Amino acid sequence: MALNLSQKQEVVAELADIAAKAHSLIAAEYAGITVSQMTAMRKQARETGVFLKVVKNTLAVRAVEGTDFAVAADKLVGPLLYAFSMEEPGAAGRLIKEFAKGNDKLQAKVVSIGGELFPASHVDVLASLPTLDQALAMLARVLSEPAAMFARAVKAVGDKQGGGDEAAAPVAETAEA
């Protein structure tokens, strides 16, 4: 279906707004994917915070002008679907990688994050980025480990000197008095 000028302007404005807020972009060839597969991918994209859209490349090029994804403008050729990660940088990578496992016709062509253009093979790197929850758990573990090591060292010194828990009991009784 052909779009008139005002419809094209709306598509460009919507995509430009999404591109300005997105963390990463993956453009992938989708030729040969069935409607049911595309519907399933769109459903999962909505659930994972990925904006997924098929638009004409000329409209996509206009939409990414002035954003971090402008570096990818000359690579946007052929039948492409655009996956923008809105919540986590790796979400689009995980989505495309997962669906490419089940369908060899879905192939990443452009990977862009933070104003940098990467080869399509970097979709695996992007997919391996931790989610926000995973990153926070890693940070908490890193921050708590020194305190845990100190506590284990103090306990080991107490055990080595023969006191351990028995030596701590008189100190606790003295503190209560």
UniProtKB/Swiss-Prot annotation:
Keywords: Ribonucleoprotein, Ribosomal protein, RNA-binding, rRNA-binding. The keyword rRNA-binding applies. Gene3D superfamilies: 3.30.70.1730. InterPro entries: Ribosomal_uL10 (IPR001790), Ribosomal_uL10-like_sf (IPR043141), Ribosomal_uL10_bac (IPR022973), Ribosomal_uL10_bac_type (IPR047865), Ribosomal_uL10_CS_bac (IPR002363). GO terms for biological process: translation. GO terms for molecular function: large ribosomal subunit rRNA binding; structural constituent of ribosome. GO terms for cellular component: cytosolic large ribosomal subunit. It comes from the Bacteria. Belongs to the universal ribosomal protein uL10 family. Forms part of the ribosomal stalk, playing a central role in the interaction of the ribosome with GTP-bound translation factors. Part of the ribosomal stalk of the 50S ribosomal subunit. The N-terminus interacts with L11 and the large rRNA to form the base of the stalk. The C-terminus forms an elongated spine to which L12 dimers bind in a sequential fashion forming a multimeric L10(L12)X complex. HAMAP family: Ribosomal_uL10. This is Large ribosomal subunit protein uL10. The gene is rplJ.
